[in-house]
Amino acid sequence: MKTKFNFIPEFVKKELRKTDAYKSRAIHNKTAVKYSEVEVILNEAPVLRLEKDLKMKPLVAIVKTQESIVGGDYINPKASWLRYERFCKNNAIPYGFLDITKSDWMKESEMYDLIICHTESNPAYQEMIESKIYILEYYMGKACFPSYHEIWQYENKNRSNYLYDYYGLPKIPTYVTHNRDEALELIEKVGYPFITKTTIGSSSIGVKKINTPREAYSLINNVFSFKGVSTQYPYQRQKNYFYIQQFIDDATFDLRIMLVGNMAFGYYRYPNKGDFRASGAGNTEKKDIPKEALRLAIEVRGKLNSRQMGVDLLYSKKNNNYYIIETSLFNQIDTPEQLVINGVPGYYDISDLDNIKFKEGKFWIQELVLRDVILEWYEKSKR
């Protein structure tokens, strides 16, 4: 349903969200609750405080995404802006809402010190938000989360792969080429089966396993044709680029590690029977994460210079190594328990890499990053 919904123009989606049929389905899927129920959900995590008395406080602009509004008195309880708003309220941070989709977005932004949003993952929204954050940050001098650097690498596997290559990070052998002749050479170099991906796509959307030369040649011919290949988004086609990744046949799970400041969270993900894709399968397990994997994720986040990052890792028993599958600025957060060990929710304190410790607690990751962004703004404002 989610994939099909991406095919629909935004103005049509907006009207559909108002219908009883859409609302009923959303309620059934727990992606819509009454506004009166939101506070109960948010209070699953204790109030997060700044832990510092700020002499100056920023005026924060919170960007709402249209996909969070179901219509009437219902809303998607997973919407990140609800957590941003909660943090501002609990810490007496002045805030307002910014509709960045309108033509007067620049004028409306002038009054704010800090703009924060959790972007929609479709390419149309990504292109818009990337362009506007560039103006906000580099021309208007606004503090933004995500920053232009952070949004540039989000939901773009090609760009992320360039950064892995530049920093020499241990990724699954992956190649991105815009050259048809080289694409034909790469399929022989990597061997079968191999994984191919579209540059934009989450929850394993756009990820395919290619098993035979016939499939590979057909895909390459189509990708480098005049029209390219259709993707999950009807207005965007895969054209003149080929993303090929070695298939690691002895991997039985992957790890998602999420990092904010000096805190790390994470869990194991498993594919459905008969499938190779763990992302989007919904099969997760929360338990202790190996320190080797944590340190690799920390290194990746540091090199990619992102204040919040999810790092997906795969473990090969044969090679006794963890490899980067991909990274993401935003991950879906359904619960304030993103790490649980022996039934106890908490996080890893990674302030000392030689002494990583598990500490108890429940947190909304969105609140943690907003806290860090506000403190960062405060320190810069004192200079």
Label each region the model flagged.
Residues 59-173, 184:
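Conserved N-proximal alpha/beta basic substrate-recognition cap immediately N-terminal to
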Residues 205, 209-300, 322-323:
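Phosphate-binding site of ATP-dependent enzymes
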Residues 1-111:
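Non-cleavable N-terminal signal-anchor transmembrane helices
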Residues 245, 306-319:
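A short glycine-rich, hydrophobically flanked beta-strand micro-motif that places a catalytic Asp/Glu
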Residues 288, 315-383:
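C-terminal active-site "lid" helix and adjoining low-complexity regulatory extension at the edge
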